[in-house]
């Protein structure tokens, strides 16, 4: 089973690891949790090899990468 690492970015800083997920439902839950907490500006998902899968601006909901 593939795993994906979820990172948060605050104030344009470095990626901060938040959690690791293995399916879309867990990824959506992490996204919703991070959005509600309001601490991070961006959510970034990377695959097991470190490749960027997506990035969203949590304030606007726009996909940025």
Task: Name each region found by the language model.
Residues 1-17:
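Short aromatic-glycine-(Arg/Gly/Cys) micro-motifs in beta-strand/loop hairpins
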Residues 11, 21-22, 62:
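Serine/threonine-rich, low-complexity intrinsically disordered segments
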Residues 13-19, 51-55:
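Surface-exposed loop/edge segments in extracytoplasmic proteins
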Residues 36-65:
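Short, mixed-charge low-complexity intrinsically disordered segments
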């Amino acid at each position: 089973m593939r795993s994906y690492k979820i990172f948060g970015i605050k104030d344009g800083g470095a990626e901060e690891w938040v959690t690791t997920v293995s399916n879309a439902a867990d990824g959506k839950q992490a996204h919703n949790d991070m959005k509600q907490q309001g601490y991070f500006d961006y959510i970034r998902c990377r695959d097991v090899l470190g490749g960027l899968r997506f990035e969203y601006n949590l304030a606007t909901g726009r996909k940025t990468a």
